[in-house]
Structure formats: structure tokens, C-alpha cells
């Protein structure tokens, strides 16, 4: 056996190139779904007779669950083998995609999207951790560059691809086209994916996970209800207040835990804080435009989905 042949945590050799290919294809499919539905919003509003504030939950709910899963994944990566975790994440994503593809109503479609988000929330940070584990330090820059291209390219293609499919086929085909690729990735991963990240026995703070879910979920629901109910609505005010309270409790708990669910002390660094704020503002602008522009172009100007 060559000295350069990589081995997993059990000392068994594996093909690093094939493993990376499987990871990147799977990541492309999962990340593509983040922006795949925005162009289809007007079509889905007509299909299910729902408002814009309702249909936007297909994206905001997806991003919320995705965000909640990322810190949980840090615990999962150290607790379970990377092979089993990747197979589980892609299986969950497949179940969510099938649920969306067969959804008879909007509620089922939303549930499918949230299931998809659980899989994506695990697979994305897992990809980055695996890349750092299987490449030596001098090659990690190139490896992260490859994953960055996929993570950046997939969301950029999503709206255009969605517009073409909506104009020429059925909205269900947005999920139908992904199904065979995900199945192929699962089959390849079963044979090619290896356990490459050393395991430990970490603990997770369940209360922090609950506080963050309720806090960010309430805040997001409150803001999303403004379009229908207005800023003076007791429902809107109530959810916003609950969200702020739970987020404050969550933040206080993180600052007093020895091993926090989410490390907030990094915000002591002004450089990190500025970068985080800029990234947040940029993301808000991008996601906001991705949701509003298709509605304006299609519903107000009467243009096609592909044009929007």
C-alpha cells in the first residue's frame, strides 16, 4: 500500500477523489434547494390559494431549521461516524424531497421543506469538516475552494432553473428532477463514503436548543405575519416579544455555560462582529430580493417565471 494512500479512522484505505465527488454532488443537490422555490412562489400561491406571507415560509422556514441544525451538527459530527451521518442526512433529505413531490396541500409541502432543511443543516457543515479531515494543511485551501464553488454555484442556478421548469413543466418537477440524483448519491455513498472524522463523547445542552428554536422561530413568525396583520396586531407583537425574551434567555445561558451550544464570546472580536453583521445584511438583501422580485415580475408585470 502506498504511503500516500489515505485511511479512515479504522485504518482502512479509501479513494479520496471518489469520496469528494460524492460529497460535492450531494451538496450541490441539497444547497440548490435553498433557492429553487423562490421563482415558483407565484405559481404555488395560485396552486394552493395562499398569500405571499404564507408561501415565503417555504424559504424562511427552510433557512430557520437549517440554521438551528448547524450547531447541533457540531455535536453529531463528534458523536457519530461521518459515514453514517452523511447517509442519514441524505436519507432525511430524500424523505423531505419525496414529501414535497407528492404534497397534496401547502401544509404537507411545508413539512417536506422542513424535513429537507434538517438534512441540509447536517450535510453542509459535515462537508466542510470532512474536507478539513481528509486533506493535509497545504491542500485544505484548494479543498475548501472546491466546496465553496459548489455552495456558491448551486444557489445561483436555482432561480433560473426553477423559472425554466415552471414555464415548461409542473412545479412538482422541481423536486422530481432532484430525486434520482439523491438516490444515486445515496447508493454511491453507501459504497464510497468512509468514517474519516475522529469520534469523541460530547454533550449537548438540550435547553439551549429549545430556547433557540422557540426564540428564533417566534421572531421569524412575528415578522412574517406583519404583511397580513400589520405592526399593530397583538399576534405580531406577542410573537416578537416572546422571540426577544427567549433569544435573550438563550444568549444569557450561552455566556454562562462552560461548553455553550453556540459560542457567543467570539463577538468580543470587533473584526468578527463587523464581518458577521456585513454577512447578515448581505444575506438579508439577497434572500429578500430573491423572494420579492419574482412576485413583482410575475404578478405585477405579468412576465414569465423564467424571465423573473
Where are the language model's segments positioned?
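Transmembrane-helix bundle of Major Facilitator Superfamily
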Residues: 2-191
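Flexible interhelical linker loops that connect adjacent transmembrane helices
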Residues: 7-13, 186-213, 232, 255-270
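12-transmembrane solute porter fold
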Residues: 17-32, 37-41, 48-61, 72-74, ...
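Cytoplasmic-side transmembrane-helix entry/capping segments in multi-pass membrane proteins
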Residues: 88, 140-150, 201-211, 236, ...
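Helix-loop junctions at the membrane-solvent interface of multi-pass transporters
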Residues: 95-103, 169, 191-195, 226-230, ...
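Alpha-helical transmembrane bundle and helix-membrane interface signal
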Residues: 136-137, 193-200, 223-237
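C-terminal membrane-cytosol helix-exit motif in multi-pass small-molecule transporters
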Residues: 179-198, 213-225, 242-256
Amino acid at each position: 500500500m502506498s504511503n500516500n494512500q489515505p485511511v479512515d479512522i479504522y485504518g482502512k484505505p479509501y479513494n479520496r477523489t471518489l469520496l469528494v465527488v460524492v460529497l460535492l454532488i450531494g451538496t450541490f443537490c441539497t444547497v440548490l434547494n435553498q433557492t429553487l422555490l423562490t421563482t415558483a412562489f407565484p405559481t404555488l400561491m395560485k396552486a394552493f390559494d395562499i398569500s405571499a406571507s404564507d408561501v415565503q415560509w417555504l424559504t424562511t422556514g427552510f433557512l430557520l431549521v437549517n440554521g438551528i441544525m448547524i450547531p447541533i451538527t457540531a455535536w453529531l459530527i463528534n458523536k457519530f461516524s461521518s459515514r453514517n451521518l452523511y447517509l442519514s442526512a441524505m436519507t432525511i433529505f430524500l424523505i423531505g424531497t419525496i414529501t414535497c413531490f407528492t404534497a397534496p396541500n401547502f401544509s404537507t409541502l411545508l413539512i417536506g421543506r422542513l424535513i429537507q432543511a434538517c438534512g441540509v443543516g447536517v450535510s453542509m457543515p459535515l462537508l466542510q469538516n470532512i474536507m478539513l479531515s481528509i486533506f493535509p494543511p497545504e491542500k485544505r485551501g484548494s479543498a475548501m475552494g472546491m466546496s465553496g464553488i459548489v455552495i456558491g454555484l448551486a444557489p445561483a442556478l436555482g432561480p433560473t432553473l426553477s423559472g425554466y421548469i415552471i414555464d415548461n413543466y409542473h412545479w412538482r418537477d422541481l423536486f422530481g428532477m432532484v430525486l434520482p440524483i439523491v438516490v444515486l448519491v445515496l447508493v454511491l455513498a453507501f459504497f464510497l463514503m468512509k468514517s474519516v472524522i475522529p469520534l469523541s463523547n460530547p454533550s449537548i445542552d438540550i435547553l439551549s436548543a429549545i430556547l433557540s428554536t422557540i426564540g428564533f422561530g417566534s421572531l421569524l413568525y412575528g415578522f412574517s405575519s406583519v404583511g397580513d396583520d400589520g405592526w399593530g396586531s397583538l399576534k405580531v407583537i406577542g410573537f416578537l416579544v416572546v422571540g426577544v425574551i427567549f433569544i435573550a434567555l438563550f444568549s444569557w445561558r450561552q455566556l454562562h455555560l462552560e461548553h455553550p451550544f453556540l459560542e457567543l464570546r467570539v463577538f468580543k472580536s470587533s473584526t468578527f462582529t463587523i464581518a458577521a453583521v456585513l454577512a447578515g445584511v448581505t444575506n438579508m438583501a439577497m434572500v429578500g430580493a430573491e423572494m420579492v422580485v419574482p412576485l413583482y415580475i410575475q404578478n405585477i408585470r405579468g412576465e414569465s417565471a423564467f424571465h423573473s
